[in-house]
Protein backbone atom coordinates (compact mmCIF):
# COMPACT_ATOMS: atom_id res chain seq x y z
CA UNK A 1 0.00 0.00 0.00
CA UNK A 2 1.28 3.47 -0.90
CA UNK A 3 1.12 5.41 2.34
CA UNK A 4 1.26 8.68 0.39
CA UNK A 5 -2.12 7.99 -1.23
CA UNK A 6 -5.30 9.21 0.50
CA UNK A 7 -6.78 6.54 2.75
CA UNK A 8 -9.97 4.91 1.52
CA UNK A 9 -12.42 5.40 4.37
CA UNK A 10 -14.44 2.34 3.35
CA UNK A 11 -11.82 0.26 5.13
CA UNK A 12 -12.19 2.31 8.30
CA UNK A 13 -14.43 -0.31 9.83
CA UNK A 14 -14.19 -2.83 12.64
CA UNK A 15 -12.92 -6.12 11.24
CA UNK A 16 -15.98 -7.99 12.44
CA UNK A 17 -18.16 -5.94 10.10
CA UNK A 18 -16.34 -7.71 7.26
CA UNK A 19 -16.42 -11.17 8.83
CA UNK A 20 -20.15 -10.78 9.51
CA UNK A 21 -20.63 -9.54 5.96
CA UNK A 22 -18.88 -12.62 4.61
CA UNK A 23 -21.10 -14.75 6.83
CA UNK A 24 -24.27 -13.01 5.65
CA UNK A 25 -23.13 -13.60 2.09
CA UNK A 26 -22.47 -17.30 2.75
CA UNK A 27 -25.90 -17.80 4.32
CA UNK A 28 -27.86 -15.92 1.64
CA UNK A 29 -28.62 -12.99 3.95
CA UNK A 30 -26.84 -10.28 1.98
CA UNK A 31 -30.11 -8.95 0.55
CA UNK A 32 -32.07 -9.15 3.82
CA UNK A 33 -33.33 -5.62 4.54
CA UNK A 34 -32.37 -4.45 8.01
CA UNK A 35 -33.10 -1.39 10.14
CA UNK A 36 -30.50 0.11 12.46
CA UNK A 37 -30.80 3.06 14.87
CA UNK A 38 -28.03 5.37 16.02
CA UNK A 39 -28.69 6.68 19.52
CA UNK A 40 -26.90 7.47 22.77
CA UNK A 41 -27.76 6.60 26.34
CA UNK A 42 -26.46 9.49 28.44
CA UNK A 43 -25.69 13.19 27.94
CA UNK A 44 -22.02 13.95 28.68
CA UNK A 45 -21.13 15.86 31.86
CA UNK A 46 -24.47 15.04 33.44
CA UNK A 47 -26.09 17.58 31.14
CA UNK A 48 -29.68 17.82 30.07
CA UNK A 49 -29.21 18.01 26.29
CA UNK A 50 -26.73 17.09 23.55
CA UNK A 51 -26.14 18.55 20.08
CA UNK A 52 -26.20 16.30 17.01
CA UNK A 53 -23.28 16.79 14.61
CA UNK A 54 -21.20 14.87 12.09
CA UNK A 55 -23.85 14.22 9.44
CA UNK A 56 -22.01 16.04 6.64
CA UNK A 57 -18.99 13.76 6.96
CA UNK A 58 -21.25 10.70 6.98
CA UNK A 59 -22.87 11.93 3.75
CA UNK A 60 -19.46 12.32 2.09
CA UNK A 61 -18.47 8.86 3.27
CA UNK A 62 -21.63 7.18 1.96
CA UNK A 63 -21.31 8.91 -1.40
CA UNK A 64 -17.75 7.61 -1.81
CA UNK A 65 -18.11 4.06 -0.48
CA UNK A 66 -16.12 1.57 -2.55
CA UNK A 67 -13.46 -1.08 -2.21
CA UNK A 68 -10.30 -0.58 -4.23
CA UNK A 69 -8.26 -3.36 -5.79
CA UNK A 70 -5.71 -2.83 -3.02
CA UNK A 71 -8.46 -3.34 -0.44
CA UNK A 72 -9.59 -6.55 -2.13
CA UNK A 73 -6.02 -7.81 -2.27
CA UNK A 74 -5.53 -7.11 1.44
CA UNK A 75 -8.75 -8.91 2.37
CA UNK A 76 -7.78 -11.88 0.19
CA UNK A 77 -4.45 -12.06 2.02
CA UNK A 78 -6.27 -12.64 5.30
CA UNK A 79 -7.58 -15.98 3.94
CA UNK A 80 -10.93 -15.55 5.70
CA UNK A 81 -13.17 -14.36 2.90
CA UNK A 82 -14.68 -16.28 0.00
CA UNK A 83 -13.85 -15.26 -3.56
CA UNK A 84 -17.57 -14.76 -4.16
CA UNK A 85 -17.74 -12.27 -1.29
CA UNK A 86 -14.63 -10.45 -2.51
CA UNK A 87 -16.15 -10.22 -5.98
CA UNK A 88 -19.30 -8.75 -4.41
CA UNK A 89 -17.17 -6.13 -2.65
CA UNK A 90 -15.49 -5.18 -5.93
CA UNK A 91 -18.73 -3.50 -7.10
CA UNK A 92 -20.00 -2.57 -3.64
CA UNK A 93 -22.06 0.61 -3.32
CA UNK A 94 -24.59 1.79 -0.74
CA UNK A 95 -28.15 1.30 -2.04
CA UNK A 96 -30.17 1.84 1.13
CA UNK A 97 -32.09 4.61 2.87
CA UNK A 98 -30.91 6.88 5.68
CA UNK A 99 -32.93 9.30 7.78
CA UNK A 100 -31.29 11.58 10.35
CA UNK A 101 -31.86 14.62 12.52
CA UNK A 102 -30.21 17.71 10.96
CA UNK A 103 -26.90 18.80 12.42
CA UNK A 104 -27.29 21.28 15.24
CA UNK A 105 -30.47 19.64 16.56
CA UNK A 106 -30.71 19.35 20.36
CA UNK A 107 -31.13 15.64 21.09
CA UNK A 108 -31.79 13.42 24.08
CA UNK A 109 -30.89 9.91 25.23
CA UNK A 110 -32.38 6.83 23.54
CA UNK A 111 -34.02 8.62 20.62
CA UNK A 112 -32.83 7.78 17.08
CA UNK A 113 -30.41 10.37 15.72
CA UNK A 114 -30.15 8.32 12.53
CA UNK A 115 -32.01 5.36 11.07
CA UNK A 116 -30.49 3.15 8.38
CA UNK A 117 -32.60 0.86 6.18
CA UNK A 118 -30.39 -1.21 3.92
CA UNK A 119 -29.37 -4.74 2.91
CA UNK A 120 -27.62 -6.44 5.81
CA UNK A 121 -24.03 -6.20 4.55
CA UNK A 122 -24.38 -2.53 3.55
CA UNK A 123 -25.93 -1.56 6.87
CA UNK A 124 -23.27 -3.48 8.79
CA UNK A 125 -20.23 -2.14 6.95
CA UNK A 126 -21.02 1.53 7.57
CA UNK A 127 -21.46 1.18 11.35
CA UNK A 128 -17.96 2.11 12.47
CA UNK A 129 -17.53 5.26 10.41
CA UNK A 130 -21.05 6.49 11.12
CA UNK A 131 -20.47 6.16 14.86
CA UNK A 132 -16.98 7.63 14.65
CA UNK A 133 -18.21 10.86 13.08
CA UNK A 134 -21.47 11.26 15.00
CA UNK A 135 -19.92 10.38 18.35
CA UNK A 136 -16.92 12.67 17.98
CA UNK A 137 -18.61 15.71 16.50
CA UNK A 138 -21.70 15.44 18.72
CA UNK A 139 -19.40 15.27 21.74
CA UNK A 140 -17.48 18.41 20.75
CA UNK A 141 -20.58 20.33 19.63
CA UNK A 142 -22.24 19.49 22.95
CA UNK A 143 -19.21 20.63 24.95
CA UNK A 144 -18.90 23.81 22.89
CA UNK A 145 -22.55 24.60 23.46
CA UNK A 146 -22.11 24.24 27.21
CA UNK A 147 -19.04 26.49 27.14
CA UNK A 148 -20.81 29.12 25.02
CA UNK A 149 -23.86 29.11 27.26
CA UNK A 150 -21.59 29.62 30.27
CA UNK A 151 -19.99 32.59 28.51
CA UNK A 152 -23.40 34.30 28.49
CA UNK A 153 -23.13 36.02 25.13
CA UNK A 154 -19.40 36.69 25.22
CA UNK A 155 -17.26 35.50 22.32
CA UNK A 156 -15.82 31.98 22.59
CA UNK A 157 -12.96 30.92 20.32
CA UNK A 158 -11.77 27.32 19.86
CA UNK A 159 -8.03 27.25 20.64
CA UNK A 160 -7.30 23.54 21.03
CA UNK A 161 -5.64 22.18 17.88
CA UNK A 162 -2.26 21.46 19.47
CA UNK A 163 -3.87 19.48 22.27
CA UNK A 164 -6.40 17.61 20.10
CA UNK A 165 -6.27 13.84 19.81
CA UNK A 166 -4.90 13.69 16.30
CA UNK A 167 -5.25 15.85 13.22
CA UNK A 168 -8.84 14.81 12.48
CA UNK A 169 -9.73 15.60 16.08
CA UNK A 170 -8.48 19.14 15.51
CA UNK A 171 -9.93 19.68 12.04
CA UNK A 172 -13.47 18.37 12.39
CA UNK A 173 -13.42 19.22 16.09
CA UNK A 174 -13.20 22.90 15.17
CA UNK A 175 -16.14 22.40 12.80
CA UNK A 176 -18.20 20.80 15.57
CA UNK A 177 -17.23 23.54 18.04
CA UNK A 178 -18.48 26.15 15.57
CA UNK A 179 -21.82 24.32 15.29
CA UNK A 180 -22.06 24.34 19.08
CA UNK A 181 -21.63 28.11 19.22
CA UNK A 182 -17.94 29.06 19.01
CA UNK A 183 -17.27 32.18 16.95
CA UNK A 184 -14.10 30.84 15.35
CA UNK A 185 -11.01 28.70 15.67
CA UNK A 186 -7.23 28.91 15.73
CA UNK A 187 -7.12 25.95 13.30
CA UNK A 188 -6.30 27.36 9.87
CA UNK A 189 -7.16 24.26 7.87
CA UNK A 190 -10.65 24.14 9.38
CA UNK A 191 -11.24 27.56 7.84
CA UNK A 192 -9.81 26.42 4.52
CA UNK A 193 -11.88 23.21 4.41
CA UNK A 194 -15.10 24.15 6.19
CA UNK A 195 -15.19 27.91 6.50
CA UNK A 196 -14.81 28.02 10.28
CA UNK A 197 -13.43 31.57 10.76
CA UNK A 198 -9.76 31.28 11.72
CA UNK A 199 -7.91 33.92 13.65
CA UNK A 200 -5.09 34.52 16.07
CA UNK A 201 -2.61 37.07 17.29
CA UNK A 202 0.64 36.23 19.04
CA UNK A 203 2.38 33.75 21.30
CA UNK A 204 4.84 34.46 24.09
CA UNK A 205 7.62 33.70 21.62
CA UNK A 206 6.75 36.88 19.68
CA UNK A 207 7.34 38.96 22.80
CA UNK A 208 10.56 37.11 23.59
CA UNK A 209 11.95 37.69 20.09
CA UNK A 210 12.34 41.43 20.75
CA UNK A 211 14.69 43.25 23.08
CA UNK A 212 11.77 44.54 25.13
CA UNK A 213 8.10 43.84 25.62
CA UNK A 214 7.25 47.35 24.47
CA UNK A 215 9.15 46.89 21.20
CA UNK A 216 7.30 43.62 20.59
CA UNK A 217 3.93 45.28 21.14
CA UNK A 218 4.82 48.32 19.05
CA UNK A 219 5.97 46.12 16.15
CA UNK A 220 2.79 44.09 16.28
CA UNK A 221 0.59 47.18 16.30
CA UNK A 222 2.52 48.53 13.32
CA UNK A 223 2.09 45.26 11.42
CA UNK A 224 -1.57 44.63 12.30
CA UNK A 225 -3.05 47.96 13.37
CA UNK A 226 -6.66 46.82 12.88
CA UNK A 227 -6.14 43.48 14.62
CA UNK A 228 -3.89 44.29 17.54
CA UNK A 229 -4.52 41.94 20.45
CA UNK A 230 -1.44 41.83 22.65
CA UNK A 231 -0.46 38.99 24.99
CA UNK A 232 0.40 40.78 28.21
CA UNK A 233 1.47 38.02 30.63
CA UNK A 234 4.94 37.08 29.32
CA UNK A 235 6.74 38.88 32.17
CA UNK A 236 4.57 40.85 34.60
CA UNK A 237 0.98 41.37 33.55
CA UNK A 238 0.08 44.47 35.55
CA UNK A 239 3.47 46.16 35.98
CA UNK A 240 4.79 45.78 32.45
CA UNK A 241 2.35 43.94 30.17
CA UNK A 242 -0.70 46.18 30.39
CA UNK A 243 1.29 49.46 30.66
CA UNK A 244 3.39 48.52 27.62
CA UNK A 245 0.26 47.60 25.69
CA UNK A 246 -1.30 50.97 26.52
CA UNK A 247 1.88 52.74 25.44
CA UNK A 248 1.91 50.88 22.10
CA UNK A 249 -1.77 51.66 21.56
CA UNK A 250 -1.16 55.33 22.33
CA UNK A 251 1.85 55.67 20.04
CA UNK A 252 0.74 53.52 17.09
CA UNK A 253 -3.04 53.19 17.04
CA UNK A 254 -4.33 56.46 18.45
CA UNK A 255 -2.63 58.66 15.79
CA UNK A 256 -4.42 56.54 13.16
CA UNK A 257 -7.78 57.01 14.87
CA UNK A 258 -8.00 53.30 15.71
CA UNK A 259 -9.84 52.59 18.94
CA UNK A 260 -10.52 48.86 18.62
CA UNK A 261 -7.79 46.68 20.06
CA UNK A 262 -7.29 44.02 22.69
CA UNK A 263 -5.15 42.34 25.29
CA UNK A 264 -5.02 38.68 26.33
CA UNK A 265 -4.17 36.90 29.57
CA UNK A 266 -3.06 33.27 29.41
CA UNK A 267 -2.05 32.76 33.04
CA UNK A 268 -2.39 34.06 36.57
CA UNK A 269 -5.40 34.99 38.66
CA UNK A 270 -7.68 35.79 35.75
CA UNK A 271 -10.50 37.34 37.77
CA UNK A 272 -8.14 39.68 39.63
CA UNK A 273 -6.01 40.55 36.59
CA UNK A 274 -8.93 41.37 34.31
CA UNK A 275 -10.57 43.67 36.85
CA UNK A 276 -7.32 45.56 37.39
CA UNK A 277 -6.57 45.67 33.65
CA UNK A 278 -10.04 46.94 32.80
CA UNK A 279 -9.60 49.91 35.12
CA UNK A 280 -6.12 50.65 33.75
CA UNK A 281 -7.38 50.57 30.16
CA UNK A 282 -10.41 52.73 30.92
CA UNK A 283 -8.33 55.25 32.84
CA UNK A 284 -5.93 55.44 29.88
CA UNK A 285 -8.76 56.20 27.46
CA UNK A 286 -9.15 52.72 25.94
CA UNK A 287 -12.69 51.67 26.91
CA UNK A 288 -13.11 49.78 23.62
CA UNK A 289 -10.07 47.60 24.25
CA UNK A 290 -11.31 44.02 24.60
CA UNK A 291 -9.96 41.59 27.16
CA UNK A 292 -9.54 37.98 26.06
CA UNK A 293 -8.54 35.19 28.43
CA UNK A 294 -7.37 31.61 27.97
CA UNK A 295 -5.65 29.02 30.21
CA UNK A 296 -7.35 25.59 30.43
CA UNK A 297 -10.88 26.95 30.58
CA UNK A 298 -14.18 25.10 30.51
CA UNK A 299 -17.80 25.93 31.32
CA UNK A 300 -17.32 25.51 35.07
CA UNK A 301 -14.29 27.79 35.24
CA UNK A 302 -15.99 30.36 33.01
CA UNK A 303 -19.02 30.37 35.30
CA UNK A 304 -16.73 30.88 38.27
CA UNK A 305 -14.84 33.75 36.66
CA UNK A 306 -18.02 35.59 35.75
CA UNK A 307 -19.47 35.00 39.22
CA UNK A 308 -16.35 36.74 40.60
CA UNK A 309 -16.98 39.77 38.41
CA UNK A 310 -14.10 39.12 36.01
CA UNK A 311 -13.97 41.71 33.23
CA UNK A 312 -13.81 39.49 30.16
CA UNK A 313 -14.99 40.08 26.61
CA UNK A 314 -13.84 36.84 24.98
CA UNK A 315 -12.66 33.37 25.95
CA UNK A 316 -10.12 31.21 24.15
CA UNK A 317 -10.95 27.63 25.09
CA UNK A 318 -8.51 24.89 24.16
CA UNK A 319 -7.79 21.42 25.46
CA UNK A 320 -10.86 21.05 27.65
CA UNK A 321 -13.10 21.78 24.67
CA UNK A 322 -11.36 20.03 21.77
CA UNK A 323 -10.88 16.84 23.84
CA UNK A 324 -14.08 17.22 25.91
CA UNK A 325 -11.70 16.50 28.77
CA UNK A 326 -14.30 16.17 31.53
CA UNK A 327 -16.10 13.33 29.70
CA UNK A 328 -14.33 12.44 26.46
CA UNK A 329 -16.74 9.77 25.14
CA UNK A 330 -20.18 10.42 23.67
CA UNK A 331 -21.33 6.80 23.81
CA UNK A 332 -23.47 6.60 20.70
CA UNK A 333 -24.38 3.08 19.55
CA UNK A 334 -25.69 1.47 16.35
CA UNK A 335 -28.29 -1.20 17.05
CA UNK A 336 -30.47 -3.45 14.92
CA UNK A 337 -34.12 -2.63 15.56
CA UNK A 338 -35.95 -4.56 12.80
CA UNK A 339 -35.59 -6.80 9.77
CA UNK A 340 -37.81 -6.99 6.72
CA UNK A 341 -39.15 -10.27 5.34
CA UNK A 342 -39.38 -10.97 1.63
CA UNK A 343 -43.10 -10.13 1.69
CA UNK A 344 -42.31 -6.66 3.12
CA UNK A 345 -43.38 -7.45 6.67
CA UNK A 346 -41.24 -5.59 9.20
CA UNK A 347 -40.23 -7.73 12.18
CA UNK A 348 -39.17 -5.77 15.29
CA UNK A 349 -35.96 -6.78 17.07
CA UNK A 350 -34.78 -5.97 20.57
CA UNK A 351 -31.53 -6.19 22.54
CA UNK A 352 -32.23 -7.34 26.10
CA UNK A 353 -29.89 -6.60 28.98
CA UNK A 354 -29.84 -6.92 32.75
CA UNK A 355 -28.88 -3.25 32.62
CA UNK A 356 -32.22 -1.55 31.95
CA UNK A 357 -30.53 1.39 30.26
CA UNK A 358 -29.10 -0.94 27.61
CA UNK A 359 -32.42 -2.45 26.54
CA UNK A 360 -33.14 -1.11 23.07
CA UNK A 361 -36.36 0.26 21.62
CA UNK A 362 -37.46 -2.12 18.85
CA UNK A 363 -38.97 -1.54 15.40
CA UNK A 364 -38.71 0.96 12.60
CA UNK A 365 -39.65 4.21 14.31
CA UNK A 366 -40.36 7.89 13.90
CA UNK A 367 -39.46 10.56 16.43
CA UNK A 368 -41.40 13.78 16.95
CA UNK A 369 -40.81 16.90 19.01
CA UNK A 370 -43.83 18.53 20.60
CA UNK A 371 -43.75 22.33 20.84
CA UNK A 372 -46.21 24.41 22.82
CA UNK A 373 -48.50 26.05 20.28
CA UNK A 374 -48.54 29.30 22.27
CA UNK A 375 -45.00 29.30 23.68
CA UNK A 376 -42.98 27.69 20.88
CA UNK A 377 -41.05 25.83 23.57
CA UNK A 378 -40.12 22.15 23.31
CA UNK A 379 -42.21 20.13 25.75
CA UNK A 380 -41.49 16.47 24.92
CA UNK A 381 -40.13 14.07 22.31
CA UNK A 382 -42.33 11.18 21.22
CA UNK A 383 -41.19 7.97 19.53
CA UNK A 384 -43.72 5.95 17.54
CA UNK A 385 -43.89 2.94 15.26
CA UNK A 386 -43.28 4.07 11.68
CA UNK A 387 -46.92 3.74 10.56
CA UNK A 388 -48.56 5.61 13.45
CA UNK A 389 -50.22 8.96 12.81
CA UNK A 390 -49.66 11.77 15.32
CA UNK A 391 -52.63 14.15 15.39
CA UNK A 392 -51.56 17.37 17.10
CA UNK A 393 -55.10 18.76 16.95
CA UNK A 394 -56.21 16.32 19.66
CA UNK A 395 -55.04 15.75 23.25
CA UNK A 396 -52.44 12.98 23.48
CA UNK A 397 -51.46 11.01 26.56
CA UNK A 398 -47.78 10.13 26.83
CA UNK A 399 -46.01 8.12 29.50
CA UNK A 400 -42.50 7.48 30.74
CA UNK A 401 -41.31 4.19 29.16
CA UNK A 402 -39.44 3.20 32.34
CA UNK A 403 -42.08 4.37 34.81
CA UNK A 404 -45.37 3.94 32.99
CA UNK A 405 -47.39 5.36 35.88
CA UNK A 406 -45.87 8.76 35.06
CA UNK A 407 -48.29 10.13 32.51
CA UNK A 408 -48.77 13.52 30.87
CA UNK A 409 -51.55 14.70 28.58
CA UNK A 410 -50.26 16.92 25.78
CA UNK A 411 -52.66 19.62 24.61
CA UNK A 412 -52.32 22.69 22.41
CA UNK A 413 -49.10 21.44 20.84
CA UNK A 414 -47.46 21.26 17.44
CA UNK A 415 -45.72 18.01 16.41
CA UNK A 416 -42.57 18.20 14.27
CA UNK A 417 -40.86 15.08 12.94
CA UNK A 418 -37.16 15.30 13.78
CA UNK A 419 -35.59 12.99 11.21
CA UNK A 420 -35.41 13.98 7.55
CA UNK A 421 -34.52 11.75 4.56
CA UNK A 422 -30.82 11.87 3.68
CA UNK A 423 -30.47 8.95 1.22
CA UNK A 424 -33.23 7.07 -0.59
CA UNK A 425 -32.30 4.09 -2.71
CA UNK A 426 -28.63 4.95 -2.29
CA UNK A 427 -29.07 8.44 -3.74
CA UNK A 428 -28.56 11.59 -1.69
CA UNK A 429 -31.83 13.52 -1.46
CA UNK A 430 -30.78 15.96 1.26
CA UNK A 431 -29.32 19.37 0.49
CA UNK A 432 -26.82 20.16 3.20
CA UNK A 433 -27.10 23.63 4.76
CA UNK A 434 -24.04 25.83 5.08
CA UNK A 435 -22.04 25.69 8.29
CA UNK A 436 -23.25 29.15 9.43
CA UNK A 437 -26.83 27.99 8.77
CA UNK A 438 -26.25 24.89 10.91
CA UNK A 439 -24.83 27.04 13.71
CA UNK A 440 -27.79 29.43 13.55
CA UNK A 441 -30.24 26.51 13.53
CA UNK A 442 -28.57 25.12 16.65
CA UNK A 443 -28.85 28.48 18.38
CA UNK A 444 -32.53 28.79 17.47
CA UNK A 445 -33.35 25.26 18.61
CA UNK A 446 -31.51 25.61 21.92
CA UNK A 447 -33.66 28.69 22.54
CA UNK A 448 -36.76 26.45 22.45
CA UNK A 449 -35.61 24.55 25.55
CA UNK A 450 -36.64 25.62 29.02
CA UNK A 451 -33.85 26.83 31.38
CA UNK A 452 -34.49 23.83 33.61
CA UNK A 453 -33.31 21.53 30.81
CA UNK A 454 -30.26 23.68 30.05
CA UNK A 455 -28.90 24.16 33.57
CA UNK A 456 -25.60 22.44 34.32
CA UNK A 457 -26.48 21.06 37.75
CA UNK A 458 -29.30 18.54 38.12
CA UNK A 459 -31.04 19.43 34.86
CA UNK A 460 -34.67 18.52 34.33
CA UNK A 461 -35.11 15.15 32.61
CA UNK A 462 -36.67 16.15 29.32
CA UNK A 463 -39.56 13.88 28.34
CA UNK A 464 -38.65 11.26 25.71
CA UNK A 465 -41.65 8.96 25.64
CA UNK A 466 -42.81 5.99 23.60
CA UNK A 467 -46.23 5.63 22.02
CA UNK A 468 -48.43 3.04 23.70
CA UNK A 469 -48.22 0.90 20.55
CA UNK A 470 -44.42 0.94 20.58
CA UNK A 471 -44.30 0.38 24.32
CA UNK A 472 -46.62 -2.62 23.92
CA UNK A 473 -44.37 -4.15 21.25
CA UNK A 474 -41.33 -3.61 23.46
CA UNK A 475 -42.98 -5.20 26.49
CA UNK A 476 -44.17 -8.16 24.41
CA UNK A 477 -40.64 -8.81 23.16
CA UNK A 478 -39.25 -8.48 26.68
CA UNK A 479 -41.79 -10.96 27.98
CA UNK A 480 -40.93 -13.41 25.22
CA UNK A 481 -37.29 -13.02 26.13
CA UNK A 482 -35.91 -13.19 22.60
CA UNK A 483 -35.38 -11.01 19.56
Language-model-derived ranges and their functions:
Residues 1-32, 36, 41, 45-47, ...:
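Gly/Ser/Thr/Ala-enriched C-terminal appendages of enzymes
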Residues 199, 263, 291, 313-315:
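Hydrophobic residues within beta-strands of alpha/beta enzymes
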Amino acid sequence: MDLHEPLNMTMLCDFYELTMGNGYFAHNLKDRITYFDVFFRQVPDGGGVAIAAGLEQVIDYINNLHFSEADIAYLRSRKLFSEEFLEYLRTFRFTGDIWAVPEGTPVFPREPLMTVRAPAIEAQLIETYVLLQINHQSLIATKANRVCRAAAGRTVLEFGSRRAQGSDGAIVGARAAFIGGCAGTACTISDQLYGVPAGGTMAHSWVQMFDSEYEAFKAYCETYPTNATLLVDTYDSLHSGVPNAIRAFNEVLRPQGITKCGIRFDSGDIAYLTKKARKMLDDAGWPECKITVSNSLDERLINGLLDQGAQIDAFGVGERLITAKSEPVFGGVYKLCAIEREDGTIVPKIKISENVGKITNPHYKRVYRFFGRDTGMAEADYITVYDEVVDDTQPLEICDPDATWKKKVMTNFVAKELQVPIFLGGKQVYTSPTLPEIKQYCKEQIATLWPEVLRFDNPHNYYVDLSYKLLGIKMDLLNKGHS
